[in-house]
Every structure is written in C-alpha cells, then in structure tokens.
C-alpha cells in the first residue's frame, strides 16, 4: 500500500496535481491530502474576539480576513501551530452608537506566517472537546 501511494505521488508530481474545479467532480486523494495539511489559510477573525475591550463600539465589517494556521496533522497527539507571526493592518469602520459617529481606522491583527505540527500540551485537551472549535471529537472516527 505504501509503495502504491508513493507511486501515485510520483506520478502526480510528474504530471501535475489535478484540480477539482468542475462542480460535482471528485477531488483526488493526493489533492485532498495536500490541501488539508497544516498551513496558513485565509481565515475570518471576529474583531470583538481579538479586541474584547471594544464592546462599546460596533465594527463594519465585524470580522476581517487574516492568514492563520489550520489543517490536519498526521497524528492526534500533534496540533497545527503557528511558528511565525507578524502584525498586519486592516481598515474597518468603528461606529460609536452612543454618539452616532463613525470613522474608518486601521486596526492591527496577528497574522501567521509559518506553521508546523507540534505536540499538544495537556491543556489542549478539554474533556474530549476540540478547543479551537468547541466541537466534540469523535471517539471512534473509523468505526
């Protein structure tokens, strides 16, 4: 089986990765595997989650796109973790509902530049729940 997967990977490297762009087309295994790997991806981040002390204001839009680490690691004991970060500015409209005013301003957000799979710390497991999404983990995912 391992030899077969290696042969398929080599074949795709030679011919190029197929792209599942046609609606309803099945995405090939190697493309699924590559696209699900731990890497930076554009993610929408809630401004109020990044700036919880700003609850007196409204923001338009209420979330902004930034690159964040996300994806699957080869083992449940590993977690996709940011290893590099920098700050980026995003223009948003800050609305003060009490004064009836608004202004466009630049707010800073952390953007991930590099990711890798690293061992989970004991605090990463929260009673069988995924701390990033709050969704329960499947106890027997392949049964």
UniProtKB/Swiss-Prot annotation:
PROSITE patterns, alphabetized: PDGF_1 (PS00249), PDGF_2 (PS50278)
Example of a GO cellular component annotation carried by this entry: membrane
Biased composition annotated in UniProt, kind: Basic and acidic residues: 130-143
CDD domains hit by this protein: PDGF (cd00135)
UniProt subcellular location: Secreted
Keywords on record: Disulfide bond, Growth factor, Pyrrolidone carboxylic acid, Secreted, Signal, Toxin
Residues carrying Pyrrolidone carboxylic acid: 25
Disulfide bonds: 38-80, 69-115, 73-117
Swiss-Prot/TrEMBL GO biological process terms: induction of positive chemotaxis; positive regulation of angiogenesis; positive regulation of endothelial cell proliferation; positive regulation of mast cell chemotaxis; response to hypoxia; sprouting angiogenesis; vascular endothelial growth factor receptor signaling pathway; vascular endothelial growth factor signaling pathway
GO MF term set: chemoattractant activity; growth factor activity; toxin activity; vascular endothelial growth factor receptor binding
Annotated transmembrane regions: none
One Pfam family recorded for the sequence: PDGF
Tissue expression summary: Expressed by the venom gland.
Signal peptide: 1-24
Region span, Disordered: 115-143
PTM remark: The N-terminus is blocked for N-terminal sequencing, suggesting a Pyrrolidone carboxylic acid at Gln-25.
Family named by the database record: Belongs to the PDGF/VEGF growth factor family. Snake venom VEGF subfamily.
Function per UniProt: Snake venom VEGFs that may contribute to venom dispersion and prey subjugation by inducing vascular permeability and hypotension. This protein induces an increase in capillary permeability when intradermally injected into mice. Also provokes a drastic hypotensive effect after intravenous injection. The hypotension is mediated by nitric oxide (NO), which is produced by VEGF-activated endothelium NO synthase. Also induces angiogenesis in vitro.
Binding partners and assembly: Homodimer; disulfide-linked. Interacts with VEGF receptor-2 (KDR).
Protein name: Snake venom vascular endothelial growth factor toxin
Species this protein is from: Protobothrops jerdonii (Jerdon's pitviper)
């Amino acid at each position: 089986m391992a030899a077969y997967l290696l042969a398929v990977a080599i074949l795709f490297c030679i011919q190029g990765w197929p792209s599942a762009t046609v609606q309803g087309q099945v995405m090939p295994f190697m493309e699924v595997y590559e696209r699900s790997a731990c890497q930076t991806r554009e993610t929408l981040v809630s401004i109020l989650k990044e700036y919880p002390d700003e609850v007196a204001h409204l923001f338009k839009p209420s979330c902004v796109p930034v690159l964040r680490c996300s994806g699957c690691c080869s083992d449940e004991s590993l977690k996709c973790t940011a290893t590099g970060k920098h700050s980026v500015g995003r223009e948003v409209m800050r609305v003060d509902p009490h004064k009836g005013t608004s202004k466009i301003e630049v707010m800073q957000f952390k953007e991930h530049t590099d990711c890798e799979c690293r061992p989970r710390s004991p605090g990463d497991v929260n009673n069988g729940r995924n701390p990033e999404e709050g969704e329960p983990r499947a106890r027997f995912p392949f049964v």
